[in-house]
Amino acid sequence: QSIPYAIRNLERLSIASPLPAELPALTDVVRQLVGSSILRQIGNASLALTVRVLSFSYRDGLPEDDSGHGGGWVFDCRFLPNPGREERFATLTGRDPAVAGYLQSEPAVRVFLDRVKALVDDAVDNYRGRNFTDLSVAFGCTGGRHRSVYCAERLGEHLRGRGVAVELRHREIGSGS
């Protein structure tokens, strides 16, 4: 039962502390172990999928992939209407009801989120069927406080409604759940 957990730990360690280049055979073995879906399924432990949802500002660069496998998406919200340009929303975030109401009333935002949800739902179903444990979805905008936060919150809410474990982080406003 501990093998799947050991594989996840090995995966995280191999990312945090890569093996030296002069050990290519060992690097290949670690890569094969980490990539083995069979080893991840051994034992009675049921491995659950966790979707990591993140909001961020493009000003500070793309977020790091903590899972190490790179599975998921980065969505650019800068094309959506920007509440940050309106004085009344300047000090608020996408978590505040006034900003959420503004963005929810915009057809482009609703269409965008519907499409993102459909895409992520397909991936969640696929990942669950293959016993994958990590999927990342990041939303970026100019300041990382309004549009990206709102979109991350809505996706997290949607996924939790489907019974999916969600880790939600807002890099620029320093909070999440």
Region roles according to the model:
Residues 1-137, 174-177:
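C-terminal accessory "lid"/substrate-recognition subdomains
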Residues 114-121, 149-153, 157:
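A generic structural signal for well-ordered alpha-helical surface patches
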Residues 133-156:
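Catalytic cysteine-centered active loop of the rhodanese-like fold, especially the PTP/DSP P-loop
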Residues 156-166:
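Post-Walker A helix-loop "phosphate-sensing" segment adjacent to the P-loop in P-loop NTPases
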Residues 164-175:
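Short beta-strand-centered segment that lines the nucleotide-binding/catalytic pocket of NTP-utilizing
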